[in-house]
A protein has these predicted regions:
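A short beta-strand motif characteristic of beta-propeller blades
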Residues: 13-21, 60-66, 104-110, 156-162, ...
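A flexible loop/linker signature enriched in serine peptidases of the S9 family
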Residues: 1-5, 19-27, 36, 41-53, ...
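Residue-level detector of Asp-centered blade-edge/turn motifs that repeat once per structural unit
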Residues: 35-36, 78-79, 124-125, 175-176, ...
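C-terminal, active-site-flanking charged/polar segments
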Residues: 191, 199-258
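Short loop/turn segments that connect beta-strands within beta-propeller blades
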Residues: 8-12, 56-60, 99-103, 147-151, ...
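Outer-membrane beta-barrel initiation region
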Residues: 184, 239-287
């Protein structure tokens, strides 16, 4: 049963908090935590019109904030406790802001048809918003915006990094607001990368064999990551130290071709080269 849970860093136990109605396939829900009010914000009915919900960590009570809002990718702005998210309707993606008491949403900016916006995060001081973008041609990028400029109607990023076809996933701010940590399949396997906001420098901080995902910065260059294993995703701690050299994974097909070059000639020919007349066995009326 899909549910919200609290994971203990001390012993690895998970406390069941709330069942999730209509979970997403891989991520269960879009989840945001407000430590000031000790509230979890999340989405339900994710394969319908998506409701925005709140769960009080002190009382254990759930309440519905917005019904059928079509809003996900939630994140809390620690400066004013507003919720930010992404709304999907008729192929149009819209960045929205939901101020307390979370009864209505305000449009910030709508992207052109076909462009995507996902994996939002807001800096600890509430001044910057980061997001991943997907273009119609398949190019993916990470961008950083000033929130004051967004509220003034200006949708121009101050920083960004183009990942090409390698999707940037789960990028989040470090506690000091200097870096963004996230994952990408840049080397053929999902590694964790650190993006420095001041100068736009990006560096790998992991060299995974099976893949690391969804980093959570703890401070002092410590991260919690999810490692992909045969038993599913397993939480692990990682020292986020920049690496100079990364090993690319070896694809079995590529290895076979290098060892046996004749495989390159094992290709199915074009149907246009087939002599169809020679294949006829009998002609007549079809009954």
């Amino acid at each position: 049963m899909a549910h919200l849970g609290e994971f203990s860093l001390a012993d690895g136990s998970v406390e069941h908090l709330q069942d999730e109605k209509g979970p997403m396939l891989y991520r269960v829900t879009s989840l945001a935590h407000d430590p000031q009010s000790r509230t979890l914000f999340y989405t339900s009915d994710n394969y319908a019109y998506r409701d925005v919900m709140a769960f009080d960590l002190d009382t254990g009570k759930e309440r519905q904030l917005l019904k059928e809002a079509r809003i996900g990718e939630l994140v809390v702005n620690p400066a004013d406790q507003s919720l930010w998210g992404v709304r999907h309707l008729n192929g149009i993606v819209t960045l929205v802001r939901i101020p307390p008491p979370y009864t209505e949403w305000n449009q910030i900016h709508s992207l052109p048809y076909g462009e995507l916006l996902y994996d939002l995060d807001i800096s600890p001081d509430g001044k910057l918003l980061s997001a991943s973008f997907g273009q119609v041609d398949g190019n993916q990028s990470l961008r950083v915006f000033e929130i004051d400029a967004l509220l003034a109607g200006e949708f121009e990023s101050i920083r960004g990094f183009d990942f090409g076809a390698a999707v940037p996933e789960g990028f989040v701010f470090s506690p000091d607001g200097k870096y963004l940590y996230g994952s990408s399949f840049y080397t053929g396997v999902s590694n964790i990368f650190r993006y420095e906001i001041a100068d736009g420098d990006i560096q790998a901080v992991s060299n995974a064999e099976t893949g690391f995902f969804r980093p959570l910065p703890l401070g002092d260059d410590q991260l919690i990551v999810f490692e992909f294993t045969g038993d599913g995703f397993v939480p692990a701690k990682l020292d986020a130290q920049p690496l100079e050299d990364l090993s690319s994974i070896t694809f079995l097909g590529q290895q076979l071709v290098e060892e046996h070059p004749q495989i390159k000639d094992w290709q199915v020919g074009s149907p246009a080269e087939v002599d169809l007349e020679s294949k006829i066995k009998r002609e007549g009326d079809y009954v």
